[in-house]
Amino acid sequence: MLRLPGSVEGLFWAAGLALLLSGAAGAASHDAVGAPAALHATQDDLLDRALDKLQALSVAVLERPHCGGPRQLATYNMGLNQLCLSSELRRQPRLRELVLSHELVHVVQDCLDGLDNSTSLSLAQGLRNTGAFTDQQVAGFFLQYLRSQGNLQHVLATTSVLPQDSRQRELEAYALQYDPALVQRLLATHCKVKS
């Protein structure tokens, strides 16, 4: 990754964020799900709105005792447009928020390539498609989030066994999971209900 002085790196980060939020990173041409969440909404309200938006997008939300493999609290299946949340999350609201935000990033990635197919597009690819950033700048955008959270090395180690495209999608989800308001905005901007 290209190491830039902090202020310059911050400018690239802010510019990338602005492009993601503006929809310039490649939103499908459908009608909007709804307006951005109110500024003073509680996190529970934001999560409930996100779940409502998923329903409007025809993304099935299932609550089950187990989702995926052992110790997995949630999964998003892009081929089926199906989100599974472990019922264990009901007892742990903060963890529920974190896990749901992580999975919502995967929904946004799926929206970037169209919910009607079984593929997704990484947010990084969406930024690259704008032509405004180099690969190094795009990588720095998400690594900045992970660095600021102090979990960069853990996430890199956890995702190292994945194929590169899957790894990129997971890095993005881990990077943005601690910013539920941003994830909500990405969902509203890039995931549209067909007219």
Specify the residue positions occupied by each region the protein language model found.
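Bacterial N-terminal signal peptides that target proteins for export
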Residues: 2-13
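Short alpha-helix carrying the canonical HExxH Zn2+-binding catalytic motif
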Residues: 93-108
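Metalloprotease/metallohydrolase-associated module, dominated by Zn2+-dependent proteases
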Residues: 60, 68-72, 123-195
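Auxiliary, metal-adjacent structural segments of Zn-dependent hydrolase domains
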Residues: 26-84, 88-92
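Acidic/His-rich structured neighborhood in mature extracellular/periplasmic domains
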Residues: 69-70, 95-97, 111-112, 122
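Solvent-exposed loop/turn segments at secondary-structure junctions
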Residues: 89-91, 114, 180
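Bacterial N-terminal signal peptides
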Residues: 11-22
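Catalytic Zn2+-binding segment of zinc metalloproteases
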Residues: 104-121
